[in-house]
A protein has these predicted regions:
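Short, well-ordered alpha-helical packing segments
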Residues: 13, 20, 24, 106, ...
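Short, surface-exposed, charged/polar-biased interaction segments
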Residues: 29, 33-37, 97, 126-130, ...
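Internal mixed beta-strand/loop scaffold within catalytic domains of large alpha/beta enzymes
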Residues: 58-135
């Protein structure tokens, strides 16, 4: 089934909202079920704040501070505008027409334990005269653990390989 560009944008935006809701629910369940240090603290719940972008679009920041997670941000945005002449030379499909549209999600989670690395993930759908998905993920350890790093990267690559034909950097 072919979707028009307008339908693709609508579907992508709705998918990111749904993904945000699923991710926030999963983090809140972990907070509710947690039974370790800081268990006397109240479980974290997400608070949401809407924002608008000058030039078009906006998003919603979802922030949680909890007893397992020191702080988690799950942010979605849908923005549009025109790339500068210089920048449009660097972006696929923007050389012919510098207008863009983008929708995406970003997740950053910091745990209380220094033994658990912070994690970041983002993915986005971008439309110029062409359209594509992009994104990535990483761990930021406070205490280096090569086993964690290798497990993370192999699991991430294995998942991507199941669904996508990508070059992994």
């Amino acid at each position: 089934m072919y979707l028009s560009t307008s339908d693709q944008k609508k579907e992508a935006t709705e998918w990111f909202i749904s993904l945000r809701d699923q991710i926030c629910s999963a983090f809140e369940r972990l907070e509710e079920d947690y039974d370790g240090p800081n268990k006397s603290m109240m479980p974290g719940k997400f608070a949401r704040k809407h924002w608008e972008r000058d030039g078009g679009g906006g998003g919603v920041m979802s922030i949680m501070e909890g007893r397992l997670f020191e702080k988690v941000g799950v942010n979605i945005s849908t923005v549009m505008g025109t790339f500068s002449q210089e920048f449009s030379k660097e972006i696929t499909g923007a050389q012919e027409d510098p207008r863009f549209w983008a929708s995406g999600i970003s997740v950053v989670a910091h745990m209380w334990s220094p033994h658990v690395p912070a994690v970041h993930m983002n993915t986005r759908h971008i439309t110029t005269t062409k359209s594509w998905f992009g994104g990535g993920s990483d761990l930021t350890p406070m205490i280096r653990n090569d086993d964690d790093r290798e497990l993370f990267h192999s699991a991430f690559e294995g998942t991507c390989d199941k669904y996508l034909s990508l070059i992994h950097i």
